[in-house]
């Protein structure tokens, strides 16, 4: 088996309208030589694969990905392109800064000798988590190290991998054996058993309105929230903060750029 890293960057700068997420996967060997890559998304997929394929053809390494100078403007990319970012993530593994595992490898660990640790916020954990996980938000981790057993392997994860990496560094510096799940819960969630779909159709008669008619109404119990351009856990936390401030029967409309936000 070869080292694998998953990443979920935006196709271009998140503060620029229309930023949509990519999902990227990179395979490489212990010397850093690139063995393959995959990417899916709505925008900017082809150029990332073209770049990595070119580096692969020239027998390049993950270190080469980190040094590439690629076209940059907010509508097209970020100052650090997703290709650079997946190179950084792979380089961290090769440098020994972090040890990773994939969701597919999770069943291979002895759960009696390990702790599955979710380092996301309490709101994110309540919204969905891996079975058997213990929730300690990364911001509270230093104060709650006493809740963890140093004799057990810590299997940390967050939403996409960044906070899991930070948690793994904190834990390693305090003498814990720890691995971070690359790609985080976002990668794992698509492999979890599917939730049953809502029934189709409406069983009762209802009045219909056009969008123009709805917008024309002055609804005192109506709030609009723009969660576009926020990185995790920003959108979910912003929704929770708004909901905590709302009264019963108020309606909340949420606008988000991430197609998977509804999950």
Region locations from a protein language model:
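Short, surface-exposed connector motifs at secondary-structure boundaries
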Residues: 33, 149-153, 245-252
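Structured beta-strand/loop patches that form or line metal/cofactor-binding pockets in enzymes
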Residues: 1-31
């Amino acid at each position: 088996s070869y080292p694998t890293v998953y990443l979920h960057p935006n196709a271009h700068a998140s503060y620029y309208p229309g930023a949509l997420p990519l999902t990227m996967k990179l395979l490489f060997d212990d010397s850093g030589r690139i063995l393959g890559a995959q990417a899916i998304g709505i925008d900017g997929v082809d150029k990332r694969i073209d770049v990595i394929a070119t580096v692969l053809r020239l027998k390049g390494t993950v270190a080469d990905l980190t040094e590439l100078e690629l076209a940059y403007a907010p509508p097209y990319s970020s100052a650090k392109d997703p290709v650079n970012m997946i190179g950084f993530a792979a380089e961290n593994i090769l440098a020994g800064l972090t040890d990773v595992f994939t969701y597919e490898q999770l069943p291979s660990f002895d759960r009696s000798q390990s702790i599955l640790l979710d380092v996301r916020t309490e709101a994110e954990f309540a919204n969905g988590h891996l079975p058997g996980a213990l929730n300690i938000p990364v911001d509270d981790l230093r104060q709650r190290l006493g809740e963890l057993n140093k004799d057990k392997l810590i299997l940390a994860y967050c939403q996409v991998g960044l906070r899991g990496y930070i948690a793994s560094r904190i834990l390693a510096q305090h003498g814990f054996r720890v691995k971070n799940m690359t790609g985080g819960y976002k990668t794992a969630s698509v492999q979890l058993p599917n939730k049953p779909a809502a029934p189709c159709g409406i069983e009762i008669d209802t009045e219909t309105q056009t969008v123009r008619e709805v917008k024309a109404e002055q609804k005192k119990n109506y709030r609009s929230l723009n969660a576009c351009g926020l990185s995790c856990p920003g959108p979910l936390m912003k929704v929770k903060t708004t909901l905590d401030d709302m009264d019963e029967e108020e309606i909340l409309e949420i606008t988000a750029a991430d197609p998977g936000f509804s999950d």
